[in-house]
Amino acid sequence: MKNIFIVGGAGYVGSVLIPKLLQRNYKVTCFDLMIYGENLLKKHENLKIIKGDMRDQNLLKNIIKDFDSVIHLACISNDPSFELNPDLGKSINFDAFEPLVKICENSSINQFIYASSSSVYGIKNEQNVNEKMSLEPLTDYSKFKVKCEEVLQKYNSKNFTTTIIRPATVCGYSPRQRLDVVVNILTNLAYH
């Protein structure tokens, strides 16, 4: 059974992803600050939840053992929140990233998946954006996503495969619902 460690697993994306992984018989450890509550994920025999801060390198060194893969979802996830406290945003979205990657590389982990953002492309005139296009981030949030991608690419090797995904704005229902996304706001208004 594949054993996955998810950083930021109790957030908007993670709280949807984890049940899907459990349905597919993965063993999952969710590592999260739990600032939105500790009851977002239903108990499951293959789910372990650890409350913690990804900036705590000593804690991470002690718990990142015997995992096959890491999925990194943790971040201050929108520009207005990031701008409220830029130092906090930088400490979570960038400063803690490379130490985490190093810890993972030095453990048994052989795959690291990073959730970046399509915002790294900036504004393009082309109708279809592809990953060969230049990165032109416009905000601190997207600039730090680019920097993390650059860091992660340095660590890619035969024994430590790194994958970067660049989703567009994610919307839809989640146990940790986001109401800073226009589609979610409109859906919520229509439903209620």
Q: Where would I find each of the regions flagged by the language model?
A:
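Conserved Rossmann-fold NAD(P)-dependent oxidoreductase catalytic core, especially the SDR/UDP-sugar
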Residues: 72, 98-139
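NAD(P)-dependent short-chain dehydrogenase/reductase
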Residues: 150-192
